[in-house]
Amino acid sequence: MSEVTRVVVDAMGGDYAPEWIIRGAVEAINEGAKAQVILTGKEDVIKKELAKYTYDQSKIEVVNATEEITCHEAPVQAVRSKKDSSLVVGLNMVKNGEADAIISAGSSGAILAGGQLVVGRSKGVKRSPLAPLPVSYTHLTLPTNSLV
């Protein structure tokens, strides 16, 4: 793994995408995150949103993906049929060593299915982990359900 963590961020995944996803990526970079952010999604839409911010442009890369997976789609079918979705493009980057991690606020089912179908599980992991971040205005809870 490189010194700087290369993190794919699915810019099109989530209820408030891409605006809030991109804002979060820019804020992370501006606050000193030691990461190279790779935003996947519709390049023209992402670049238009990025133009609203001031940030170190060498730390954010945009990779075009023409399709999106929504929460209303069957996860496995969506991952298999939408090869140029922002999620699947990002997962392939992780699989091919072009990125170290992926973050998505999109369909949980598609994220789990894609992780297993595209990237695969790490040795010793029996069941795919899910780490949602439930938040309130007063605290953050970090549950996990991985089985190693």
Show where each model-derived region lies:
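Proline-rich intrinsically disordered, low-complexity coils
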Residues: 18, 129-132, 143
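Conserved small/polar residues in nucleotide/adenosyl-binding loops
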Residues: 138-144
